[in-house]
């Protein structure tokens, strides 16, 4: 095994390391599809897709293109590569986080939310980038530094009806799908 003798550490526990999180997600997805098949509720003719690590999960669990063991090796290697693309302190902290922004709760349009995120990046000189528009005007994934995301949260305000327009995603310290990871993608 190429990882023999390697010790993995994270201040919050190894499941917060993306390589282990991705393995856990792949294992869960495969188990869920297997359970649906066993229960007779999985529609084999349905179109199935995944996003990001979910693409690998769909290939393995749904199509059988990848065996489970190969899937787990692949997503572990993928997560390890992403983990190492991000500078870290001696304690393993990266200085990056991922947040969910809900523009409608701050009474912002799609364009206003996009401009706000860009202005935080420009004003702070740090990464703050919408990396996925999950639902236009309702839910965006934003990657950034701890400092930039704190400023974004401040500018978004408290929201309405007791619902915050800003939610920090716990346990994520890799700025997935952002410009910060471009060095890891060959041209």
Where are these regions (language model features)?
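FabD-like malonyl-/acyl-CoA
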Residues: 1-113
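Alpha/beta catalytic cores of group-transfer enzymes, especially the acyltransferase/condensing modules
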Residues: 61-187
């Amino acid at each position: 095994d190429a990882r023999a003798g390697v010790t993995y550490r994270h201040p919050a526990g190894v499941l917060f390391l993306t390589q282990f999180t991705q393995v856990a997600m792949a294992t869960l997805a495969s188990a869920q599809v297997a359970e649906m098949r066993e229960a007779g509720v999985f529609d084999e003719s349905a179109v199935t897709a995944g996003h990001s690590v979910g693409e690998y999960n769909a290939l393995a669990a749904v199509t059988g293109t990848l065996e489970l063991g190969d899937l787990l090796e692949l997503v572990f290697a993928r997560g390890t590569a992403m983990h190492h693309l991000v500078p870290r302190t001696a304690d393993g902290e990266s200085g990056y986080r991922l947040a969910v922004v809900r523009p409608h709760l701050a009474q912002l349009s799609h364009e206003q939310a996009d401009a706000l995120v860009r202005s935080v990046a420009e004003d702070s000189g740090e990464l703050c980038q919408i990396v996925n528009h999950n639902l236009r005007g309702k839910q965006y994934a934003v990657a950034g530094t701890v400092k930039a995301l704190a400023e974004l949260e401040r500018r978004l305000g408290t929201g309405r009806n007791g619902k915050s327009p800003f939610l920090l995603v716990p346990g994520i310290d890799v700025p997935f799908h952002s410009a910060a990871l471009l060095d890891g993608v060959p041209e």
